[in-house]
């Protein structure tokens, strides 16, 4: 599904066959030798503005101004990302980050420690960013709605009805079988 990225951008795809049982902490561990001055970007994110820069001065983890019950952190006045108590909302965490080499070295060590413990296999990779109650990287705060997680076709259609991802042969077949237009799916 992502093979087009190889020819178009020269990326190297690495597959985690254990993803169904080990989540993305173990996926990131599979590419740890490539981590240095690196963006980490989930594949289910929609960005209203390009989040990348040719020069990043510091490591950061992107959070939205939007409150989210699933958010584990909040950005404080110093730009630090601090853990929120259970039951409280934090900032929405779309999952995009940039890590300088030194922070990647720390991340590698923490991922190794976490992945040795089978209880950690279901963790998200962000667990390795924590040092006690705060993350080792600062916040990159973006306005609510600028970066969102897309989990369904309907969410993508609501956010970006002109997206080329909404047009596919599969959708045309589904529409034909159901006797509906693709906009009705």
PLM regions: where:
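Short beta-strand-to-loop acidic/aromatic patch adjacent to the donor-nucleotide binding site
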Residues: 37-46
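Short, surface-exposed amphipathic charged segments that create phosphate/polyanion-binding patches used
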Residues: 26-34, 77, 154-158
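Short, well-ordered alpha-helical microsegments
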Residues: 2-3, 24, 28, 48-50, ...
